[in-house]
C-alpha cells in the first residue's frame, strides 16, 4: 500500500489527480491544506509520496520540498509548477523531486507518478486501474 499526501488549500486543483489515484487499489490518499500541516503529518506518519500544488497557502511547493528534506529525506515529493522545464529543473535541483506536474494534473500524470514511485520502491507491479464506478 502506498501512502500519498496531497497538499493544496484548494482541493479542486488536484481533484483530477486525486480521482485517478483513488482508482488504484494500492493507494491510500490523505490531504493537507497547508505546508506546515503537511510537514507535521510527514514527521509523524509513514508517507511514500507528497504531491503539492504550486502554492500551498504558506509556502510554494518547491519551498515545501526543501523543508521536507529536513523532516524526512526518504519521502518522495512531486509539485505542480508553471515554470518552464528548464526553470523547474534549475529551481528544484538537489531537492530530489519527481517530474514536474502541470496545472490540473490528471490520470496520465497519476500513472506516471505511480510508475516512478513503484520504480523507486522496486515494486514494478500490476499497473491496472480498479474500476470503482461499476460495482
Model-derived regions, located:
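Two-component/phosphorelay signaling modules centered on CheY-like receiver
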Residues: 10-30
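Acidic, metal-coordinating helix/loop segments flanking the phosphotransfer/catalytic sites
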Residues: 31-49
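Conserved phosphotransfer cores of two-component systems
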Residues: 43-45, 67-75, 95
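Conserved phosphotransfer microenvironments
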Residues: 48-67, 85-88
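Alpha4 helix (beta4-alpha4-beta5 surface) of REC/receiver domains from two-component response regulators
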Residues: 63, 81-105
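C-terminal output helix
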Residues: 87, 105-121, 125
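CheY-like receiver
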Residues: 121-135
Amino acid at each position: 500500500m502506498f501512502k500519498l499526501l496531497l497538499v493544496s488549500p484548494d482541493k479542486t486543483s488536484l481533484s483530477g489527480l486525486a480521482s485517478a489515484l483513488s482508482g488504484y487499489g494500492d493507494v491510500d490518499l490523505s490531504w493537507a491544506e497547508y505546508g506546515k500541516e503537511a510537514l507535521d503529518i510527514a514527521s509523524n506518519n509513514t508517507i511514500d509520496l507528497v504531491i503539492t500544488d504550486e502554492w500551498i497557502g504558506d509556502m510554494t511547493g518547491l519551498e515545501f520540498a526543501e523543508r521536507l528534506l529536513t523532516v524526512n529525506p526518504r519521502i518522495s515529493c512531486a509539485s505542480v509548477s508553471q515554470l518552464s522545464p528548464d526553470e523547474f529543473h534549475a529551481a528544484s535541483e538537489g531537492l530530489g523531486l519527481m517530474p514536474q506536474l502541470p496545472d490540473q494534473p490528471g490520470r496520465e500524470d497519476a500513472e506516471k507518478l505511480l510508475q516512478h514511485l513503484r520504480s523507486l520502491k522496486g515494486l514494478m507491479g500490476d499497473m491496472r486501474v480498479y474500476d470503482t464506478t461499476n460495482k
